[in-house]
């Protein structure tokens, strides 16, 4: 009974955490995280050292094409860089844990729910941990300029879509929706219970950057040079993420239903 209660509590925390990011994905440029989640001095940082759009575009380039539920978790997790390093080290020591056993074990760790949810995706954790400077910059930008970051995600998705590099596949669906007079590109898992992490070269999918893209990390065997998007083996996420998030929950997240 204790394990069930812990798992239920973690699932609810993950729902709450991702729902906040979902509301940001809903209408880029308008929705902000609740004020209490912003660190002291964030307002001053925004006005004194606001990151320009071109730099934000490059900052989000490595993850902008992630399916929305994974994008939400990754952005939230990037605000906890130390815990990302701790999770990577923990995963190295617990390679034998899989599925529910992994979910139960990680739920006992004192980490943010967004960090715990990434335990099922070690390649994403490795990407974030291997370039912790970029991850920290991404997290700081998300805390200080949430809507600007989401606008950047949409700009990069539009670039990839215009070049024919972002479209519906067996692994994910891509739709363009108009919400509150804004055109938004929605990326969802083809199977809500299975995540496929895309690997890609930003220069190939978006074109040459104005501001240099972060270094590229490719999971072993996942990416073929010159291809747009490559996908690895699908990962069942039911034990970690209960229910759908991202654009699929836009009405709930925005308070419309």
Model-based region annotation:
Residues 2-6, 10, 14, 21-24, ...:
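N-terminal low-complexity segments enriched in Gly/Pro/Tyr/Ser
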């Amino acid at each position: 009974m204790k394990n069930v209660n812990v798992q239920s509590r973690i699932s609810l925390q993950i729902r709450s955490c991702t729902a906040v990011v979902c509301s940001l994905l809903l209408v880029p440029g308008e929705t902000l995280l609740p004020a209490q989640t912003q660190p002291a001095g964030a307002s001053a940082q925004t006005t004194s050292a606001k990151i320009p759009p071109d730099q934000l575009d490059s900052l989000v380039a490595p993850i902008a094409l992630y399916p929305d539920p994974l994008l939400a978790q990754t952005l939230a997790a990037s605000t906890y860089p130390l815990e990302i390093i701790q999770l990577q080290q923990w995963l190295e020591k617990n390679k034998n844990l899989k599925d529910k056993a992994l979910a139960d074990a990680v739920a006992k760790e004192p980490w943010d729910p967004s960090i715990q949810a990434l335990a099922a995706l070690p390649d994403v954790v490795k990407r974030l941990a291997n370039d912790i400077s970029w991850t920290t910059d991404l997290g700081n930008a998300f805390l200080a300029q949430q809507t600007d970051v989401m606008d950047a995600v949409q700009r990069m998705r539009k670039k990839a879509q215009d070049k024919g590099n972002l479209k519906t596949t067996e692994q994910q669906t891509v739709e363009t929706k108009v919400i509150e007079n804004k055109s938004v590109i929605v990326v969802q898992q083809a199977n809500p219970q299975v995540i496929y992490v895309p690997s890609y070269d930003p220069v190939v999918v978006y074109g040459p950057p104005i501001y240099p893209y972060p270094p590229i990390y490719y999971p072993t065997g996942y990416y073929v040079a010159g291809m747009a998007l490559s996908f690895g083996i699908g990962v069942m996420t039911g034990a970690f993420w209960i229910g759908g998030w991202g654009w699929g929950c836009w009405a709930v997240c925005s308070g419309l239903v």
